[in-house]
Amino acid sequence: YDASLKPNLQIPQKNIPNNDAVNIK
């Protein structure tokens, strides 16, 4: 998970490791 891809994402990547993969679509 690269936080730099979603700088506006407020959800902790620790809790949502797949969140970026879901939002990137």
Curated annotation (Swiss-Prot):
Coiled coil: none annotated. Keywords: Carbohydrate metabolism, Cellulose degradation, Glycosidase, Hydrolase, Polysaccharide degradation. The keyword Hydrolase applies. Residues 10-25 have a biased composition (Polar residues). Its EC number is 3.2.1.4. The keyword Hydrolase applies. Transmembrane segments: none annotated. Optimum pH is 6.8 with carboxymethyl cellulose (CmC) as substrate. GO terms for biological process: cellulose catabolic process. It is an enzyme of class 3 (hydrolase). It catalyses: Endohydrolysis of (1->4)-beta-D-glucosidic linkages in cellulose, lichenin and cereal beta-D-glucans. One of its GO terms (molecular function) is cellulase activity. Residues 1-25 are annotated as: Disordered. Optimum temperature is 60 degrees Celsius with carboxymethyl cellulose (CmC) as substrate. This enzyme hydrolyzes cellotetraose, cellopentaose, and cellohexaose to cellobiose and cellotriose but does not hydrolyze cellobiose or cellotriose. This is Endoglucanase 1.
